[in-house]
Structures are given as C-alpha cells and as structure tokens.
Design a protein with these regions (language model features):
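Mobile active-site "lid"/loop adjacent to the S-adenosyl-L-methionine
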Residues: 219-250
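Active-site beta-alpha loop architecture of Rossmann-like, nucleotide-cofactor-dependent enzymes
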Residues: 72, 220-223, 276
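Residue-level signal for inorganic ion chemistry
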Residues: 30, 68, 98, 154, ...
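Conserved SAM/SAH cofactor-binding pocket of Class I
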Residues: 100-133, 137-227, 254
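Non-catalytic accessory regions of SAM-dependent methyltransferases
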Residues: 1-43, 47-50
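Conserved AdoMet
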Residues: 31-108
Length: 311
C-alpha cells in the first residue's frame, strides 16, 4: 500500500462520519504520525510503499478512528500554543479556546513588565519584599499556579513564553500529572507539578502565595451531555468535564475562595468558563471581593474567559 492510497482510504472511510474536510484533516494527522513525513513530503513521496510496521499502524489507527476515537488519542499527541504535547485518555485534548486563555496571561505579564518602575532587578525586588513583608506584583518574575492542569498545556505554554516566571501546577489525577511531567521533560521546561485536590481545604492549605492563579476547571453541566459529541463523552475524562447541574460554579467558587488566601495583593485570577455562565461568574467574583473583573469572548464570539484582581 502506498502513502497516497492509505491517505485516500482514510478519507473515504471517515467522510461519512465527519465530512470530507474534517476527514482530510484527520488523514493528514494520522499519516504524518505514521510516516514521519510532512504534507509536502508525502506529496513528493506519494507512491512510496508503507513498511510492514507502518501498514500495521495504519490499520490499527484507522480501526480506532472508525470506533470514533479522537485522532489525538490515536496518535498520542496534540498541539497547543506551538508545542506538541503527549495526550492520553487521562487528560483532555488541548483546545484553541484554552490557547487564548494562556495568551491573555502571557500578554498581561509582558505588559506589566514594561510598566514604568518595573525595571528593578530580581535582587532589588527580593529586598523590597523582605523589607515590607508583602509580595509586589511587578510582572518581572511572577509566580504562577495552574489548577487542574491536565496535560500541562497552560503552565507549559506560560513557562515557554515567560521563562523567568516560577510556574507550578496541580491536579487531582495522578495519571494526568504523569502526562504533564512527561511533556515538561520533553520540552525541557521547569514546572513544579503536585497532586492536590483543590476542593480539599486541608490539601490546599500548604500552597504558597502566587502572583497569578489560572484554571480551566470542569464547567459542563450534566444536563448538557445530550448536546455533546459522542467521542468526547466516550473517550475524554469525565472528571475533567462535568459539574452537577445544581452547582455549576462549584470550582469557581472554591478557587475564588482559595485565591483570596493564596494570591498576592494585586494578583490576578484567570478562568476559562462555560459560555452560559459568564455573567454569573463575574457576579460571583465581585461578591468575593475581586475588582476589575473582565469577561472576554473567544475567537468564536462566546463568553469564554474571565480575569479578576485581588485587592
């Protein structure tokens, strides 16, 4: 079987399920994974025969796709903010909307670092902190915590683009943390990962103070299951997706409470949110005492992100 024949077979098999365009996109991803060749090279070498191993991986991959398994789980990889990450069924597949959340933080920190008065050295800042007994958010060397990190996509994107930041991340899933640590090692990025249940007050008590806390927590209500894609329900970890219908903001409430204890004065709290609860999330944070609460839409025009400032 040649590269071109294999590519066409994938499209023909998947088009009735996903449509021609999505089927072609999936075919490109799988064939690059199998052959190690980019799109242009696969065109040049379209008549090259697959090796026995490649043909076996092709058939296993196609069988998995026909079971509606996401191509990212089939290949074991997904892309986020220009980084190729390992993904397994222990973690959610990274999504473009979450890239926007990471970018918001990166841009804000870079802007803060350019403000007048923020050009002091790390030693000068450390001395000023010791003198006053308070943390000062300057944007130079922020300490950042990601809650519910999954594959580590958010903290790794932040660390890659803000190398002087001290970045930590927590998750309730040991399996997810294994994936996140593997991604950090592969990318040679220094992020501190810990097994912590954010809903457990005792477990979070030992966390230090941070300049920024970010989270993309579970936010899909159980009643929304009916409108979701089957492959998400069948393959992605439900623990990272769903919240009870009677308490859709449970994680935002808890993380907001935690951030009042663990955020430095002037620190920032960033969330990805359920588009149906934008106004409610803003109201919750304002009631918790946060100021400068901003609701932001994603590229699709949906309420998707919120940031707030601790006094």
């Amino acid at each position: 079987m040649t590269i071109q024949v294999a590519f066409i077979q994938i499209i023909q098999a998947l088009s009735p399920i996903h449509g021609d365009r999505e089927a072609a996109s999936i075919a490109h991803i799988l064939m690059e994974h199998i052959t190690g060749l980019g799109k242009m090279d696969r065109i040049v070498y379209k008549d090259r025969e697959l090796t026995e191993d490649q043909a076996d991986r092709f058939q296993k991959g196609l069988d998995a796709l026909l079971r509606n398994e996401p191509v990212q789980y089939v290949t074991g990889t997904g892309w986020f903010y220009g980084m190729e990450l390992q993904v397994t069924p222990d973690v959610l597949i990274p999504r473009p909307e979450t890239e926007e959340l990471a970018e918001w933080i990166i841009e804000d920190v870079k802007k803060a670092g350019k403000q007048p008065g923020n050009q002091e050295t790390g030693l000068e800042m450390q001395g000023r902190i010791l003198d006053t007994g308070k943390r000062i958010v300057t944007g130079l060397h922020p300490s950042i915590l990601d809650i519910g990190t999954g594959s580590g996509a958010i903290p790794l994107a932040i660390k890659k683009n803000l190398p002087s930041a001290a970045v930590s991340a927590i998750d309730i899933s040991a399996g997810a943390l294994e994936v996140a640590k593997a991604n950090a090692k592969k990318l040679s990025l220094d992020v501190n990962f810990s097994l912590v249940d954010v809903l457990d007050v005792n477990a979070t008590a030992a966390l230090p103070i941070f300049d920024i806390i970010v989270s993309n927590p579970p936010y899909i209500c159980e009643q929304e299951r009916a409108g979701m894609q089957e492959q998400v329900l069948d393959y992605e970890p439900n623990i990272a997706l769903f919240v009870p219908d009677h308490d859709p903001l449970r994680f935002y409430r808890r993380i907001g409470e935690l951030a009042q204890e663990k955020l430095a004065p002037g620190g920032g709290l960033y969330f990805e949110i359920n588009e149906a609860y934008g106004a409610e999330t803003v109201k919750l944070l304002e009631e918790q005492g946060y100021v400068e609460v901003v609701l932001k839409q994603d590229l699709f025009g949906k309420d998707r992100m919120v940031k707030a400032k601790k006094l």
